[in-house]
């Protein structure tokens, strides 16, 4: 499923002179040919030498290496993105291992916190509650008419950092950068959006540089009516768009997903994308150990919308492997700050109710307390898999990990909280506490661990292995909805590309250098499943693959021809 080399057709454009140089999607900078410089009134506006994109990328790489901090590197890359998008993606794809953590997690967290301070140039759409009656006009102001993917946030739950107001715009920008870099979706088809509904972050409200609406967050009916106005305006402007909800607070994330997933082609990456990549990782890890996921007992720390979304997808996968729903649910244990979720626990959220354990089934557990802590659960359940989505650092203690290892020779430990400052335990500690026997996957990037002269590669359970392929598959197939089965097909495909499964060694997830290949394979699986489920028009496998090839954008300059407006 490698992309076929295709001759790029000439592009006819009406812009010229300084206007063309200020258009990030079209600007080539020093790579404009002499003929183009004459035809587009660029003579004298650029240095004499005509460069290739690789020469430009090499200069940018040298400049990038001159920056000492990750946030300065992030600012530099964003500046390139805002002046020459083709060069930006060529540079990022040339150095994806180095630059993905800079354009997205963990560095994007700091960029969101400092958004108003480091702001240079507008990108995307800012829709404030004050402008709610101008929603249609705002979307009409977007110059790109053929938007195919929107990532939207309200900035309330940015990574593990909480309410960042309009600073949350850094997340949709970063996410869409990965749709392009990893999934080949043209940047001309993407649109980042932030819904500015105020902020409850007092530090931002007191910051004279803060650029958002200085007001406490709207809530309840006002909030949901505002979001609905946005959804209806999007449907009117781009009826076939894929809409990704990103970093909404727990109280809103699941209700919004449930409300709109059958009204517009949409999904929530924090819930469904995280679940899909985690399940793909667990399928691969289970196969590498010579078994199936359905044979494992799993404990979660964190029972919010993300954790419960992962749990439900695990349950669906283990049912596919032959378990009944009841048996599948009995193998999943959810622990939050109040302890193990049981049917006797008050004030459960709606999405938690199906994930409780029956209290009477726990009467023989080795504890006198009515509240079962994480250590109690690990000691009594003897899990094979421990997953952290708590957003709190250090909660996987040495005592807990050693207790788990006591009963499980090859534990799978996944501290998934972002950014790195919120991780439940570091890979270095987990490897040491399990005498080198744990299989570790994290939510943020970590360097390989060296323990007793042996190198342990650490897989990043990165949603970027999933959502770009889903987006490409939706666009190529013309899917009108994203179903649970489409997400499951993405997980299964990801597991098939595990080096640990294929070779018996290495990472449990593919290397980043292979991410475009993996995204294309996921796109095919997702598109095929969409056709099988009737949410996309059925075609031959060859036609679907051709559609993926045709929609896979490459960071290459096209030849320009002049046309009138």
Swiss-Prot record:
InterPro entries membership: Aminoacid_DH-like_N_sf (IPR046346), Malic_enzyme_CS (IPR015884), Malic_N_dom (IPR012301), Malic_N_dom_sf (IPR037062), Malic_NAD-bd (IPR012302), Malic_OxRdtase (IPR001891), NAD(P)-bd_dom_sf (IPR036291), NAD_malic_enz_proteobac (IPR023667)
Active site: 104 (proton donor), 175 (proton acceptor)
Cofactor note: Divalent metal cations. Prefers magnesium or manganese.
MF annotations from Gene Ontology: malate dehydrogenase (decarboxylating) (NAD+) activity; metal ion binding; NAD binding; oxaloacetate decarboxylase activity
EC number: 1.1.1.38
Residues that coordinate or bind NAD(+): 157, 270, 418
Protein name per the record: NAD-dependent malic enzyme
Family annotation (SUPFAM superfamilies): Aminoacid dehydrogenase-like, N-terminal domain, NAD(P)-binding Rossmann-fold domains
Source organism, top-level taxon: Bacteria
Reaction(s) catalysed (UniProt annotation): (S)-malate + NAD(+) = pyruvate + CO2 + NADH; oxaloacetate + H(+) = pyruvate + CO2
Family: Belongs to the malic enzymes family.
BP-aspect Gene Ontology terms: malate metabolic process
């Amino acid at each position: 499923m490698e992309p076929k080399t295709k001759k790029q057709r000439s592009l006819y454009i009406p812009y010229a002179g300084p206007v063309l140089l200020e258009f990030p999607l079209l600007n080539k900078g020093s790579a404009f040919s002499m003929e183009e410089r004459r035809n587009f009134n660029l003579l004298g506006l650029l240095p004499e030498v005509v460069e290739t994109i690789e020469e430009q990328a090499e200069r940018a790489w040298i400049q990038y290496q001159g920056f000492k901090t990750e946030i300065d590197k992030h600012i530099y890359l964003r500046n390139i993105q805002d002046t020459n998008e083709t060069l930006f993606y060529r540079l990022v794809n040339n150095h994806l291992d180095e630059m993905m953590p800079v354009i997205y997690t963990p560095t994007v967290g700091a960029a969101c916190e400092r958004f108003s301070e480091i702001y240079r140039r507008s990108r995307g759409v800012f829709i404030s509650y004050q402008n709610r009656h101008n929603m249609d006009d705002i979307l009409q102001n977007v110059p790109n008419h053929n938007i195919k993917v929107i990532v939207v946030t309200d900035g309330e739950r940015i990574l593990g950092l909480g309410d960042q107001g309009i600073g949350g715009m850094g997340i949709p920008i970063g996410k869409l950068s990965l749709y392009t870099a990893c999934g080949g979706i043209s940047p001309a088809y993407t649109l980042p959006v932030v819904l500015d509904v105020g902020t409850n972050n007092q530090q931002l409200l007191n910051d004279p540089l803060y650029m958002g609406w200085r007001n406490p967050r709207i809530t309840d009916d006002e909030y949901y009516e505002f979001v609905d106005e946005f959804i209806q305006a999007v449907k009117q402007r781009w009826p076939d768009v894929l809409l990704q909800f990103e970093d909404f607070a727990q109280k809103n994330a699941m209700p919004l997903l449930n409300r709109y997933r059958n009204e517009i082609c949409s999904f929530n990456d924090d819930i469904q994308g995280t679940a899909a990549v985690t399940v793909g990782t667990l399928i691969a890890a289970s196969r590498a150990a010579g078994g199936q996921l359905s044979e494992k007992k799993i404990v979660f720390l964190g029972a919010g919308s993300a954790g419960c979304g992962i749990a439900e997808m695990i349950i669906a996968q283990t049912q596919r492997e032959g378990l009944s729903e009841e048996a599948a649910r009995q193998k999943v244990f959810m622990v939050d700050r109040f302890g193990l979720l049981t049917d006797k626990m008050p004030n459960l959220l709606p999405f938690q109710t199906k994930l409780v354990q029956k209290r009477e089934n726990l009467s023989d557990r080795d504890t006198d307390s009515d509240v079962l802590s994480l250590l109690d659960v690990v000691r009594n359940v003897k899990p094979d898999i421990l997953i952290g989505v708590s957003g709190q650092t250090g909660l996987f203690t040495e005592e807990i990990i050693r207790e788990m290892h006591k009963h499980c020779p090859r534990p799978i430990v996944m501290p998934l909280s972002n950014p790195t400052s919120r991780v439940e335990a570091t890979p270095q500690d987990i490897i040491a506490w399990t005498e080198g026997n744990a299989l570790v996957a994290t939510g943020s990037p970590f360097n390989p661990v060296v323990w007793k002269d042996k190198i342990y590669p650490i897989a990043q359970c990165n949603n970027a292995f999933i959502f770009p392929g889903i987006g490409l598959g939706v666009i190529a197939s013309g899917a009108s909805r994203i179903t649970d089965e489409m997400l499951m097909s993405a997980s299964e495909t990801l597991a098939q590309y595990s080096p640990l499964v294929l070779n018996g060694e290495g990472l449990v997830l593919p290397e980043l250098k292979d991410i475009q290949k993996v995204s294309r394979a996921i796109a095919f699986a997702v598109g095929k499943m969409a056709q099988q489920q009737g949410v996309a028009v059925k075609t031959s496998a060859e036609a679907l693959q051709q559609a993926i090839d045709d929609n896979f954008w490459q960071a290459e300059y096209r030849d320009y021809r002049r046309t009138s407006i």
